[in-house]
């Protein structure tokens, strides 16, 4: 475009027509390796659709037009509803059509469905992350509800397993698709849910009356929430629907929406239960056990979502560097910039390898070893990857310079979104304490680690040295070292996957960069070329 004073040139065009799946070599390989190659064609199809300018614009619109709380109608009657921009509904429709909320729970689900679903989740998260909150809670709650749906709600099974998104304000049994939320956090407790004060009193018909509050109650428009409340038998889990069996609204009062740093598209609410009615799931006192069943899956999604946003930030950075010229050459050809981008790509390689090994473990959790692998590495992955996200996106911003620091850039939304996954579903220290709990109390965990690490022993001296260092720490795993132990465990999990499946030069480069505490590692030109080719589908060299 020509202006009076100058001609605009050397300004890269936006990245808005790419295939989010085929451009990610590490992801394509991981999906096939971990048992979901049968979904590759579908992933390529939705990867192309999600990478369009139209899809990306929906993500922008949903965030610049946040949800609005509707407490009352014009006549003063309680509504307790939330109004969303149309872009939100289109994003949710796509997620449900692609079965990100229930793929693994279908009656005829194929082996590897958890892996395929993880890949679909990752692609959608690169477009808009807030809409993944209702999806991940629904995904985690569905298997529990398929076993424990209270008798008055047996007609919910079909819409729970449908591929439809239905935003109508109707009883769940009358809808084509359902969303399920969770209500745990209270003002005084946060992660300490045992201090919850919401009370539940058993009624004659077997239901319970709930009185109390929740301080962070995301997706208040859900058709039901799984809510923790105190009973005579201890902290318990309740199915609290939006509509009662007689068609009346339940007494769930929406007080205000949270004004959050990021996650702007998604509604998070403060609520009060004024004699709300709920149905007990399991037995009184089993609330923590039931919530933990779902918590592992939501924590995995937190790690996966942060990784996906890191991947999007990297894509924006390398695309910019490929087009932008400095000092007579493309930015991608400048040695220092090329090295920075290569190290970012290398970090993503290791994370992808571990996350999709984790997805396979979740897929095969009926096997005791796989279940233990998921139990140990899920909180470790959430702790490390969600922590890494913020500086990673900041690095991508630096690649773009000032244009990456302006509201027109996707990177600002990614940066604001990053902290939430470190906080939700248990903050960093909670994850590390959980890892220590598994290491101290789960039978067979040390045999599991030994088996995983012995399999690649002798292939890389940095890896072997790091294993010995972790073994020393685990002789007496002190709580104060929880973060260091968790971080080291995560790195070794990534390293084992890289040594097992990546090319030897790339695996050794990963181990040296990530495990050599001395630093100062220079990646060879060949490794840089390989990394950048894999990270762009062969576009940027």
What are these regions (language model features)?
Residues 4-5, 11, 18, 22, ...:
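Alpha-helix capping/hinge segments and adjacent helical runs
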Residues 455-541:
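C-terminal amphipathic alpha-helical interaction region
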Residues 207, 211-251:
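A short core secondary-structure module
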Residues 248-274:
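Flexible, small-/acidic-enriched active-site or ligand-binding loops
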Residues 1-110, 129, 540-541:
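Extended, charge-enriched "interface" segments that sit outside catalytic cores
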Residues 80-171, 218-220, 424:
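Internal helix-loop-helix
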Residues 349-382, 398, 471-482, 486:
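C-terminal helix-coil-helix/basic helical segment that borders enzyme active sites and/or dimer interfaces
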Residues 246-248, 270-298, 315-332, 466-479:
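A glycine-rich, basic-preceded beta-loop-alpha segment at the flavin cofactor/substrate interface
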